[in-house]
Amino acid sequence: MNLYLSIRIVVICVVGLFTMPMAHALSLGDIKIKSALNDPLDAEITVHSTDAGEILNANIRLASQDVHDRAGLEITRHHLRMQFKPITTGKGKFAIQVTTERPVSEPVLEFIIEVTGGSSNLIRGYAVHLDPPNL
């Protein structure tokens, strides 16, 4: 390979790197439960994102009945009361706050959420195990 061709390939690669659109990766992590059985649900889902606007402006909701059906999960009254809100947890970290206004009486709550925003469209399932409150 001659020198001219080598330089040309390097220039094309470098220009390609600078002209590519930046990909902002968004992924969902584990869920942390802060409430007990027979209390209103209070949980946080860890969010990994390189773009604050992507998660803070995302549309977060319970996935459709069809998605739950395909996963073999039933949507109950507790699911319909769930609220999802993107929050900042400090030091540039983000989470999705999952809450209900009314107490959850089921010890296991399985659900699928859908997050759409920017270039991301994520669907992920979670299983929440609620322990009785400590006496």
Language model segments and positions:
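Extracytoplasmic/periplasmic low-complexity
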Residues: M1-L135
